[in-house]
């Protein structure tokens, strides 16, 4: 069980889960391994106890534990039944529940048979999109969890943001650590871009060797357990080649933010000599590559994003993009490097938009591209991302697609260096770091 003194609040997610407390739907927390799902369940149990719920009303089961290794859906049901307290409402917390075969039968029975409130976590999307949808007929709420945002990274690493006067008469933001050492906010952001946002990094400190060990463990668990072992348990054996899986993973990591044709990936890997193996014959088919990519998407290692034709008002089927769930994992796979930082910060912005509740797509207008169209209910936001707006050529490149859009929704350009102007004909130029730490 997690030691509670190590827990730090993730209010974005805790508030979401509290909002659905004591409602009928099963609360399902999804996300990549080690992004904080178990800690979120523990935080929820602490919240319950603070509001008067007693220990005997709470049942916690983490199916990563050897104690539950051979549990079936029948023994799962009987175990829970034995812990029911008569005439009291029960609160069930099931961590990585998908490791129990036919778990959904048992969970659905708990919902029907007992006076209970159910919370579960899972590290693959297959459990939610397939079995769960069938057995619970929509009676579930998904809380999608991600690694730390930049704002959370500051909190987890005990940085405090303070505003100080700048030489030009304005203000600038600096980060102070718990030893009262101060850093430019950009320095801390560079650390975030290097180490990523996995919560475990905060436990070991910003140490590159230790970070690589932690990230290697996450990668190995996702690839070996969540993908290869899961495929074997399903009996389908669609994803069986760990070398091909790693090469596709590295290819996608190296090409975040690029338009990708699935049919070309196999040829690219072969042409670059990345699949040299005397036992492997031919080029992986587009179907095989897509199957492997789907497995990576189901494990929340990558997220895909589709293109939207702004004038035609329809989604396009080809040349979507992929973003990696944590930039630290990308650095683990490819090595720490400074090049391609533009796509890396684009990656950060994409996930920040998801955290803020937006549905995100790529915008196409004529032969130009808008980095992101972010939609939420009746709201829409067009976003361009670039490292600097100081060059006239860059300003033209980033502003022209937005200027072509004929509607009144907000349009912004996010950059690390905004230049002197804060607005261009109604298009806002916003400092990326200010935006990331804003509400």
Language-model features, listed with the residues they occupy:
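Pre-Walker A adenine-sensing motif
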Residues: 4-22
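Hydrophobic anchor at the beta1->P-loop junction of P-loop NTPases
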Residues: 29
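Conserved lysine of the Walker
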Residues: 37
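Hydrophobic positions on the alpha1 helix immediately C-terminal to the Walker A/P-loop
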Residues: 40, 44
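Short glycine-rich substrate-engagement loop in P-loop NTPases that contacts/grips substrate
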Residues: 59-88
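Structural recognition of the conserved hydrophobic beta-strand(s) that form the central parallel beta-sheet
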Residues: 117-123, 144
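Interdomain motor-coupling "hinge/lid" segment immediately C-terminal to the ATP-binding subdomain
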Residues: 131-254, 258
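Accessory nucleic acid-recognition modules appended to NTPase machines
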Residues: 203, 208-379
């Amino acid at each position: 069980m997690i030691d509670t003194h190590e827990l730090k609040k993730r209010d974005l997610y805790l508030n979401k889960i509290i909002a659905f407390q004591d409602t009928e739907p099963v609360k399902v927390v999804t996300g990549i391994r080690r992004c904080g799902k178990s800690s979120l369940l523990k935080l929820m149990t602490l919240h319950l106890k603070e509001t008067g719920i007693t220990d005997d009303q709470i049942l916690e089961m983490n199916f990563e534990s050897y104690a539950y290794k051979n549990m079936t859906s029948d023994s799962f049901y009987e175990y829970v039944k034995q812990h029911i307290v008569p005439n009291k409402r029960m609160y069930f917390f099931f961590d990585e529940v998908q490791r129990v075969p036919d778990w959904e039968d048992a969970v659905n029975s708990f919902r029907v048979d007992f006076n209970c409130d159910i919370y579960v976590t899972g590290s693959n999307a297959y459990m939610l999109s397939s079995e769960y949808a069938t057995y619970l007929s929509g009676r579930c709420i998904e809380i999608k969890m991600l690694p730390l945002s930049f704002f959370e990274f500051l909190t987890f690493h005990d940085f405090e943001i303070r505003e100080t006067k700048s030489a030009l008469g304005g203000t600038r933001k600096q980060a102070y650590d718990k030893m009262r050492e101060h850093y430019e906010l950009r320095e801390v952001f560079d650390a975030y871009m290097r180490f990523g946002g996995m919560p475990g990094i905060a436990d070991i400190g910003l140490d590159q060797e230790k970070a690589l060990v932690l990230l290697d463990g996450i990668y190995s668990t996702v690839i070996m357990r969540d993908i290869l072992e899961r495929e074997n348990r399903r009996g389908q054996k669609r994803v069986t080649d760990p070398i091909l899986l790693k090469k596709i993973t590295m290819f996608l990591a190296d090409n975040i933010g690029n338009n990708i044709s699935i049919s070309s990936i196999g040829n690219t890997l072969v042409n670059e000599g990345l699949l040299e193996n005397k036992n492997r014959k031919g080029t992986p088919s587009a179907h095989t590559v897509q199957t492997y990519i789907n497995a990576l998407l189901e494990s929340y290692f990558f997220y895909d994003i589709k293109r939207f034709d702004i004038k035609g008002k329809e989604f396009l089927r080809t040349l979507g993009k992929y973003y990696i769930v944590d930039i630290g994992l990308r650095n683990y796979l490819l090595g720490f490097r400074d090049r391609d930082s533009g796509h890396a910060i684009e990656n950060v912005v994409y996930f920040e938009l998801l955290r803020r509740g937006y549905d995100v797509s790529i915008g196409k207008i004529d032969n130009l591209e808008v980095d992101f169209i972010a939609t939420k209910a009746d709201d829409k936001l067009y976003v361009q991302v670039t490292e600097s707006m100081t060059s006239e050529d860059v300003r033209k490149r980033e502003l022209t697609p937005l200027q072509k859009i004929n509607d009144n929704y907000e349009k912004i350009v996010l950059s690390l260096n905004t230049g002197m102007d804060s607005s261009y004909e109604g298009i806002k130029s916003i400092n990326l770091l200010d935006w990331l730490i804003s509400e």
